[in-house]
């Protein structure tokens, strides 16, 4: 089993249906701005993530440009998560699609 790639617009639509979007960018970038409703997934927050998501939950992985999200998506599949997606274009693609973001500015 592997993950699928989806567009930012598809990710947003899936989030409206209950999918979990995890943002794997660094702490400073995530704190500054991130997709609205995203969970910040780090090594330190993984246990909290495991409490939030079950193995059948749709999980969308977002990074900077859509490259490193593939590695994390593969890792999640290897951990037993069955419904994993990597977001094409990452947060840059999300912003280009003019989808909602949470910011600190």
Curated annotation (Swiss-Prot):
PROSITE patterns: RHODANESE_3. It comes from the Bacteria. Gene3D superfamilies: Rhodanese-like domain (3.40.250.10). It holds the Pfam family Rhodanese. The active site is at residue 63. GO terms for molecular function: thiosulfate-cyanide sulfurtransferase activity. It catalyses: thiosulfate + hydrogen cyanide = thiocyanate + sulfite + 2 H(+); thiosulfate + [thioredoxin]-dithiol = [thioredoxin]-disulfide + hydrogen sulfide + sulfite + 2 H(+). The keyword Flavoprotein does not apply. GO terms for cellular component: cytoplasm. Its EC number is 2.8.1.1. It is found in: Cytoplasm. Residues 15-103 form the Rhodanese domain. Transferase that catalyzes the transfer of sulfur from thiosulfate to thiophilic acceptors such as cyanide or dithiols. May function in a CysM-independent thiosulfate assimilation pathway by catalyzing the conversion of thiosulfate to sulfite, which can then be used for L-cysteine biosynthesis. This is Thiosulfate sulfurtransferase GlpE. It comes from Haemophilus influenzae (strain PittGG).
